[in-house]
Structures are given as structure tokens and as C-alpha cells.
């Protein structure tokens, strides 16, 4: 159904994932103020994977690309790195949606682990090799672990 024929409340709800994605990449929230040193997770990864997997057509790839550009500007990374990562997460989620006959939360969850491992290694390999950015591997390990664990609750 076209977006113009929907009632206003359904239009607003259909834009919810996009708005939430842009809020999450703009604010770059962290739990540093709680003095939890290694507690961080990538909420945009969870959001992009979930809505690419479950919400067909709700998350436009162009808007995901622009969210990655905004994330690069906010964090201070080279432009386009986060966009490639976000779009590769979309590709993995769409692949899983197309091959799945019966959805299962546990299978989706472990495929999400595979996805964030591949995309994070791709992301950090490019950043380290080409742009000589220092990476704290403990933070990266805990970030992937907490992102994986929190996907189950979102």
C-alpha cells in the first residue's frame, strides 16, 4: 500500500525505524557516564538488521546510506566507511529473509552474530590498514558481544 493512502498515525509509525536510526547515529550514546568501561553496543546494527529482516520496505537503503554518512561525520571517521558497513548488514539481512522458510529467533540471532563479525572485521580492517587508526581490540570484542546479546531483547 502506498504511503499516501495510509492514515496519519500509520504513516508516523512507518517512519519510526528511520527516525530511530537517525537519532541513534546522531547522538552516539554511550554508557561512559555510568563508569562501565567495556559496556558498549551498536544500536544502529541491531536496528538495521532487524528492520531489514522483518520490516520489508520500511528501511530505505538510501536513507541507511545517509545515516552511515552522518555517523562518519559524528564519530570522525573517513566518509563512507559506516555506510558500507550498514549496507552490508542490509545485504546479509535481506539474504537471510530470502532463504528463510520458517523464521526462528535463535537462527536469526546466530546469523546476526555472523553478520556483525563479518561487517565489523571488514570495517576495522579498512580503518586500520588504510587509515592507520588505532583500535582497542578489547572494546571491539565487548562491543560485538554486547551487540549480539542485546539483539535478543530488541
For each feature predicted by the language model, list its residue ranges.
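Terminal, non-globular segments
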Residues: 1-154
Amino acid at each position: 500500500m502506498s504511503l499516501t493512502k495510509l492514515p496519519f498515525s500509520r504513516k508516523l509509525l512507518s517512519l519510526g525505524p528511520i527516525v530511530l536510526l537517525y537519532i541513534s547515529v546522531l547522538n552516539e550514546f554511550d554508557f561512559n557516564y555510568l563508569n562501565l568501561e567495556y559496556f558498549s553496543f551498536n544500536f544502529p546494527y541491531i536496528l538495521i538488521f532487524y528492520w531489514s529482516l522483518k520490516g520489508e520496505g520500511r528501511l530505505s537503503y538510501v536513507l541507511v546510506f545517509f545515516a552511515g554518512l552522518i555517523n562518519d561525520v559524528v564519530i570522525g571517521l573517513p566518509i563512507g566507511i559506516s555506510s558500507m558497513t550498514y549496507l552490508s548488514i542490509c545485504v546479509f539481512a535481506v539474504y537471510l529473509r530470502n532463504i528463510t522458510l520458517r523464521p526462528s529467533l535463535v537462527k536469526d540471532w546466530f546469523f546476526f552474530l555472523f553478520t556483525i563479525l563479518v561487517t565489523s572485521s571488514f570495517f576495522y580492517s579498512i580503518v586500520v590498514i588504510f587509515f592507520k587508526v588505532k583500535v582497542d581490540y578489547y572494546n571491539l570484542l565487548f562491543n560485538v558481544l554486547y551487540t549480539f546479546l542485546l539483539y535478543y531483547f530488541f
